Design a protein with these regions (language model features):
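Intrinsically disordered, low-complexity terminal regions
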Residues: 1-219
Length: 219
């Protein structure tokens, strides 16, 4: 799947989704926008034509797994989603960025080739491969662990001043900095640390290869 995902706060209690398709060679009409409701919410996908050699058909399903092989199809589908306050958001693309602005609930954002930017009053989790991650979270009471991972890009988190967490942060070509006082466990280095912020407890995992990691305190 190719295209950006842009989520922003709705003014009312209705979810509004706009999908914009464009291409140079392939037929945009061949890419279907599917809506799949479930007990947990609604899943909206761009479903590309299934390639002849695909092992399974392209389809839109709920949950973390669905098949979406595009082969040489160059259709790009950009989604704009207006999300009401209190509604959790899960955004997933492959070739594109994910931008989430001023939402009022928890956020999960995933891409492969693209950056991730999140701003929410809840907590968040994000993964990419080629791109940076920037996240501002209004809550720091996630139940178990949250993780932010990339390979080529930095990670910058803005977190509440009352944060308590067990932090594991690693980078290869970069540095790790924190505005929060840290009680370090084991060896501390500029590229790796395991430490406690506040009372500890819940886990915060941060990992990159080429990029720096920054924990910033919000007021």
């Amino acid at each position: 799947m190719s295209g950006d995902v842009h989520a922003l706060a709705a003014t009312g209690d209705q979810i509004d989704v706009t999908a914009t398709k464009h291409a140079e060679r392939s037929d945009p009409e061949a890419v279907e926008i599917k809506v799949v409701p479930s007990d947990e919410g609604v899943t909206i996908c761009a479903v590309y034509p299934t390639p002849r050699r695909a092992r399974e058909p392209n389809e839109c399903t709920t949950g973390d797994h669905w098949s979406s092989s595009t082969e040489d199809n160059d259709v790009v589908v950009d989604f704009e989603v207006r999300v009401p306050a209190g509604v959790k958001f899960y955004g997933h693309t492959v070739n594109g960025k994910v931008e989430v602005e001023h939402l009022g609930a928890d956020v999960w954002a995933y891409t492969v080739n693209g950056s991730v930017r999140v701003s929410t009053s809840g907590y968040a989790e994000a993964t990419t491969v080629n791109g940076s991650i920037t996240a501002q979270m209004g809550r720091a009471d996630w139940p178990d662990a949250v993780e932010f991972t990339t390979v080529n890009g930095g990670i910058t988190l803005d977190l509440p001043a009352n944060l308590s967490a067990e932090v594991r942060a690693t980078t290869v070509n970069g540095e790790v900095t924190s505005d929060f006082p840290l009680l370090v466990t084991g060896r501390f280095g500029p590229r790796r640390f395991h430490g406690t912020i506040g009372q500890g407890g819940r886990e915060l995992k941060l990992s990159t290869v080429n990029g720096s990691i920054r924990l910033r305190k919000t007021t």
